[in-house]
């Protein structure tokens, strides 16, 4: 029997605004003491009136444009009514009837994953369980700091066809968020949260299961694992001809399984109605266009430019554009070195051994000029590529000039041809049997003589010159 998963994602993106969605409390609350960034507005005290954040709208428009959405001039907030301990108002302010944007897409390996809608809303508080998992927790505390933090909710169409594709979609979305600067996209910190809806089609019998919602996936890896588990669980039911319950399930880290949480809610369960305290927000098209003009070059565009402008491969361009910081630093280095291919090689083989692509490159001790100086030393023959690799770490750690390190360590290449020739003559005099064997056809022994001189000079001899002189002395 053949089965195919059908997956749609609901993604909550915490926007990197200075203040919360509807009040002046700080939006960056991750490391604050519990319940220290709250006010009457974000905790829903009687008489407190919300005022929408302009920056929240700007960030939402940037995101919607980057995801190729139709951005609406007329938007309105609504109340989503439900009871939960981390929702002090008893409702969430969201955009249900008139969202910010609709009908977009994100390309993933040439395939369009359609975006149904993007709407703005406020976050709820956070429940702190006494154990790592809900099922094992004996008590739970409530931190209201996160109440009112602005969110953009992205709802995809069910175009995702595998758990792996779901993970890759989220990774690419996070990359775009970071390029735009609208969110950190850190799943581990709750800045990017994802719920998934999955059903499974039995292709042979043309039967599709009920949809199951999966929650509590706080890393890309867990999104993929949870969906793999759920795909296999639903498949087993279909194989047995059993009904799949329409429900919400949570990923349980301890058991590495999804567990049933509750029956799946429908929209009418939330009793949506217009938010009476906030009038409709109308943003003129001219204002929307001004905001869209601020969008930087996005990853796909940058990859194509790097391939054309710098002659890089798909792989090289893909790695070097992982983050906007890394891409910008690479281009600064290329301006100095005038050698994009060599710069790319050193980034991929050396620099990225010591840093994350998300590094704040302004803080690095190794500067673009150091790459140029290092390349000049190699091309002039003063140091070998192996020596350059040895001193790279010291340049990275100390910010010293490459030439300064070479002088301190006395590791400049020995390029004096007469000195190399004298050393080789002595080596050959001590190994006459190998000289004769070479002359009788064992040409592989050339490596022995070059190896001996490299050993005696501790790798400092110019290997190319040593090779040429050895051949001449051996009569070739």
UniProtKB/Swiss-Prot annotation:
Keyword annotations: ATP-binding, Ligase, Nucleotide-binding, Protein biosynthesis
The keyword Nucleotide-binding belongs to this UniProt entry's keyword annotation: yes
Species this chain originates from: Thermosipho melanesiensis (strain DSM 12029 / CIP 104789 / BI429)
InterPro entries the UniProt entry points to: Asn/Gln-tRNA_amidoTrfase_suB/E (IPR017959), Asn/Gln-tRNA_Trfase_suB/E_cat (IPR006075), Asn/Gln_amidotransferase (IPR018027), Asn/Gln_tRNA_amidoTrase-B-like (IPR003789), GatB (IPR004413), GatB_C_1 (IPR042114), GatB_Yqey_C_2 (IPR023168), Gln-tRNA_amidoTrfase_suB_CS (IPR017958)
Cross-referenced PROSITE patterns: GATB
Lineage, opening ranks: Bacteria, Thermotogati, Thermotogota, Thermotogae, Thermotogales
Functional note: Allows the formation of correctly charged Asn-tRNA(Asn) or Gln-tRNA(Gln) through the transamidation of misacylated Asp-tRNA(Asn) or Glu-tRNA(Gln) in organisms which lack either or both of asparaginyl-tRNA or glutaminyl-tRNA synthetases. The reaction takes place in the presence of glutamine and ATP through an activated phospho-Asp-tRNA(Asn) or phospho-Glu-tRNA(Gln).
Subunit composition and interactions: Heterotrimer of A, B and C subunits.
Family classification: Belongs to the GatB/GatE family. GatB subfamily.
Name of the protein in its database record: Aspartyl/glutamyl-tRNA(Asn/Gln) amidotransferase subunit B
GO process terms (BP): glutaminyl-tRNAGln biosynthesis via transamidation; translation
Reactions catalysed: L-glutamyl-tRNA(Gln) + L-glutamine + ATP + H2O = L-glutaminyl-tRNA(Gln) + L-glutamate + ADP + phosphate + H(+); L-aspartyl-tRNA(Asn) + L-glutamine + ATP + H2O = L-asparaginyl-tRNA(Asn) + L-glutamate + ADP + phosphate + 2 H(+)
EC number: 6.3.5.-
Lipid metabolism is among the record's keywords: no
Cross-referenced Pfam families: GatB_N (PF02934), GatB_Yqey (PF02637)
One annotated GO molecular function: asparaginyl-tRNA synthase (glutamine-hydrolyzing) activity
